[in-house]
Amino acid sequence: MTSYSFTEKKRIRKDFGKQRSILEVPFLLAIQVDSYREFLQEDVESTKRKDLGLHAALKSVFPISSYSGNAALEYVGYKLGQPVFDERECRQRGMSYGAPLRVTVRLVIYDRESSTKAIKYVKEQEVYLGEIPLMTGNGTFIVNGTERVIVSQLHRSPGVFFDHDRGKTHSSGKLLYSARIIPYRGSWLDFEFDPKDALFTRIDRRRKLPVSILLRALGYNNEEMLAEFFEINTFHINPDEGVQLELVPERLRGETLNFDLADGDKVIVEAGKRITARHVKQLEAAGVAALAVPDDYLVGRILSHDVVDGSTGELLANANDEISEDQLTAFRKAGVDAVGTLWVNDLDRGPYLSNTLRIDPTKTQLEALVEIYRMMRPGEPPTKEAAQNLFHNLFFTFERYDLSTVGRMKFNRRVGRKDVLGESVLYDKKYFAERNDEESKRLVAEHTDTSDILEVIKVLTEIRNGRGVVDDIDHLGNRRVRSVGEMAENVFRVGLVRVERAVKERLSMAESEGLTPQELINAKPVAAAIKEFFGSSQLSQFMDQNNPLSEVTHKRRVSALGPGGLTRERAGFEVRDVHPTHYGRVCTIETPEGPNIGLINSLAVFARTNQYGFLETPYRKVLDGKVSDDVEYLSAIEENEYVIAQANALTDAKNMLTEQFVPCRFQGESLLKPPSEVHFMDVSPMQTVSVAAALVPFLEHDDANRALMGANMQRQAVPTLRSQKPLVGTGIERAVARDSGVTVNALRGGVIEQIDAARIVVKVNEAEIGGGTDAGVDIYNLIKYTRSNQNTCINQRPLVNVGDVIARGDVLADGPSTDIGELALGQNMLIAFMPWNGYNFEDSILLSERVVEEDRYTTIHIEELTCVARDTKLGPEEISADIPNVSEQALNRLDESGVVYIGAEVRAGDIMVGKVTPKGESQLTPEEKLLRAIFGEKASDVKDSSLRVPPGMDGTVIDVQVFTRDGIEKDKRARQIEENEIKRVKKDFDDQFRILEAAIYARLRSQIVGKVANGGANLKKGDSVTDAYLDGLKKSDWFQLRMKDEDAADAIERAQKQIQAHEKEFEARFADKRGKITQGDDLAPGVLKMVKVFLAVKRRIQPGDKMAGRHGNKGVVSNVVPVEDMPYMATGESVDIVLNPLGVPSRMNIGQILEVHLGWAAKGLGRKIQRMLEAQAAVSELRKFLDDIYNHDNAINAQRVDLSQFSDEELLNLGKNLIDGVPMATPVFDGASEAEIKRMLELADLPQSGQTQLYDGRTGEAFDRKTTVGYMHYLKLNHLVDDKMHARSTGPYSLVTQQPLGGKAQFGGQRFGEMEVWALEAYGAAYTLQEMLTVKSDDVQGRNQMYKNIVDGEHEMVAGMPESFNVLVKEIRSLAIHMELEE
């Protein structure tokens, strides 16, 4: 049984799972964190770094040599500095969180004169290569002050793929096979058949060439090509006896001869009969070695080599010629004794390469190279060198072509080699053997006689011949995951390659002018490439920070889109579909609805990537029907060979599979197998789904479409004021909250020393304290009321009290949407399924007023409003409270600097920051001149451009930040904010130091009390040190004590050193912080000052807000009804929410009904415990009742709770926390059964049907029949009516058409579209229609006139010409058609 930690003892979930969990839920952000850690390799020494990430990129580009080869720049190592600002400061200042990268390079200059390349001089130096973004602990990046996530990409793995066109290319429907070699970077190489069965190649999808041109360019001639691809039949030509064939009986199978096939006198096959496998066996048994054949059997066969007259050297026939009767006569005449022909047939030995050679115009290697050059560079005149270099650079140089380790592994496996290692370029023995450079010699020496290109063509012809199968590109063995680290590495390499070009140019100067490495390298291209990737790549996304779950799922997302991936428009149905290999790797449920469906997926709970980037999933080993606890991770490729049982396969107490036939999966099919043939078994029932889907209880009872919506909508839940744990969960809520990073978890065990709303101080256990200056105190600062990316509120609340004993990993503080360390997205509401006066028609939701009253769904949203003072052409803008033509009342919330006070309650239209902008001198009217002369008005040369609260928003100002450009004097408010911040930091540091100091003294006291002293203040030699004596001493005098015991003396010395070290450290840290607070801010060009105001907006639930359960049962609130009108139960308790029962059957999400039943039981059990506590029943009675709840099930693997671990006090505390309901967990696919739900209802003294009689709140009459009632975890989604509703009076118009803009952001109007016009036409409402199309839209004069008329009290309108009609006329004129209106 498990032992429970301090946090877990507070509230225990009753778990209905039958499967013992073999694996704990892994760290959910591992894919992000591990990938980036491997990229940086920050904590690894330079010499021990693996060939990954930054190190690999730097190694691949360096050394850079000059064109002459006399100077080289070599890479030694790199190190990352410390970030200038920490995460919090970066968020506040809008900076990027990163560290400077410093690379050590060595410049080597060789002596020109010496022949042996003697070194003239060497210079080593550190070079700054820009800022590298750092990942926060939660797997995000802070770019320009906002948190972003780099989503992993699922792309086609490099390697070789074989495919066919599914008969779509040619009208006959013939399958045309093709092969494609895809490198990690470099040119693609395709091979394809055409309808006439000739084989072609394409490079980078350009014009196709016969494949023999490529082989000829590699150095093969016709004979060699034919010898590679065909087996050869040898015929002996005797001048007298006709022709003899060297017989290989197998090759005759399927042929029909026009002569009898005989062994001696015995005829085996008669003429005209087809030769079968039986005949072949007879021939083999008879041992016939040669076969006399008539001449016409040889005619028409294809020669495998050139035939030459031995005496004269005359060429009689070329290889690949068909033998004619004339040639056969010539062979006899010339005394040719044997010829070889290609063994081909129509069935399984096609003459493909032979056909191809016939259409190949080239004869020599050079011609072939030139032909390839012409195809790649049309229009450029080819030279021999250019053609050779181009061809070599395409596939055979390490700079331009890289298959990568993954590509090489996939390539070798696909062409059937055992070895998975090899070169990252395409290798061809013959090609490299003919070259003379060092690299080629090394390659030839290291490798056997292989040719990558030839082997691919061989496999392709085998597939065309009917042996072998094409690949499935949607198989997860052919798609791999590219995570953050790998993408960052690629981008970094691109930046380095740009630098390399520039360095090469400058290196030649370095030889003569003695430049240093720093002067050679310009870091800008690297920094720019990285900045561009993290700031604006398609896969660098603004983090979804609605709630902890949405953060976790965003980081676990896998996208097929992005650079080097698919595009939405081109992605077909197959790519988006669920594939058998998704099982346990990618969630089969969670994917967006809409155009991205199936292209964006989520990792399954236990999935991880292997060293090659393929997804793998864990399985338990099964040996001879016995299931072991050994776990092995298999990728989709490895899984193909094994039979795998489901997680819920029945086992006995000894872990033996009990069924005669076990349901299994094998090669993507489901089948039944005896236990002895099973190799593996699933680890957990929730293995197939993602985190979001695994949070849906009773998922197994929901239709997949609704489960998808349920999983997706949980991510949109807004954190409520007080989070409530779900009464019915699935047991992984704690893991999600833990890994999301929104809670505060103890880094080390200890005792809570001090606590307030913003800070928790832990005195660490002796055993966990490190050496050196570690004082054994951990201080956790909590996040208070900050804004998330989605404008929701992030706030942490402490959960512990002073004196609590905690262990490592315990939850010390809850964040948004967490409740005692468990994910809590919504509220547990009492729900009744019944219609109520049509208010729940079509998925509408009826709410009780009590829900609003108790603030169950009240959420806090934090809006950030920014006011920027710029330097304009007419002079600087100014932030001040002195604004022209504005009443005193409008300014009463501003201080003298013109900035709103903290705590002010503001409404739409209120001024928050006063700002004036200079305007050009306008011509004054005589009246204005007179007024100016009398009153001396000066303020008219500025206009009011203050920051006002936008329409539809009201709230309380909770924070103001003022940023001032360097070199500009700070205003009073800025100075005040600065002083407050310095005070806060000083107090924080002082407190921290005081706590540390106290901890050190307390430890010292325990180490010296009772020990004998050799002297000290008022202490004689030989006296013992007592507590009373120490209390009477000043703390600083403790260090004067001289102890007899060496350990005690050491302790005093160590304590003194520790205190001094900490004092120094705190002073340095404070000075650093103070410097950062007081320094000017780095603002955008032209910006003098920036003020940010944060508003807290309280949003109560109201009609129009969208709500949902966890089963895809979404709806919109239609009405809020007084409590007394809601249906109520016999106990007098009224329900909170009334849902429409018709929303269930057609949607097939029955999970919600089961959840409601179990939730009612959970709540009922809580009430029962409450009654026990109120009656002050004996603890033993409570213990027995809890035991009844938790341990009623006697199944082998049932999850039990050992209540004997709880002291009476802990048990009472547990009971108090269960009053609100006993939380239950029904894991996905392993949940509570109907019988168990009934048993829980029975324990709670509730009807087993889960239904009860309800009474109408308005009349008091009972309803006709009983109603399903119970508790469901219901969420409020971030689609609030306040954010969507808006109204336009007059506002901006489109520039060209002069029609009103659309949308809330533009303060736009409602479009009166085509169909609405038809409706008015149908009614014959001509005047209304005219008004809609003219003065209310784009008749400029008309609408201005209308305004004047309304002001003057004349209610009439004159419709003129709509502006859009003028636009139409002008467009027609632009087509040179003169069109004008007759007056």
Curated annotation (Swiss-Prot):
A GO molecular-function descriptor: ribonucleoside binding
One annotated GO biological process: DNA-templated transcription
NCBIfam families attached to this UniProt entry: PRK00405.1, rpoB
Family: Belongs to the RNA polymerase beta chain family.
HAMAP family: RNApol_bact_RpoB
Species the sequence originates in: Xanthomonas oryzae pv. oryzae (strain PXO99A)
EC number: 2.7.7.6
Cellular component per GO, a single term: DNA-directed RNA polymerase complex
Subunit-structure text: The RNAP catalytic core consists of 2 alpha, 1 beta, 1 beta' and 1 omega subunit. When a sigma factor is associated with the core the holoenzyme is formed, which can initiate transcription.
Phylogenetic placement of the source organism: Bacteria, Pseudomonadati, Pseudomonadota, Gammaproteobacteria, Lysobacterales
Pfam family, one: RNA_pol_Rpb2_1
CDD domains: RNA_pol_B_RPB2
PANTHER family the UniProt entry points to: DNA-DIRECTED RNA POLYMERASE I SUBUNIT 2
Domain of life: Bacteria
This protein's name: DNA-directed RNA polymerase subunit beta
Function (record text): DNA-dependent RNA polymerase catalyzes the transcription of DNA into RNA using the four ribonucleoside triphosphates as substrates.
Keywords: DNA-directed RNA polymerase, Nucleotidyltransferase, Transcription, Transferase
Catalytic activity: RNA(n) + a ribonucleoside 5'-triphosphate = RNA(n+1) + diphosphate
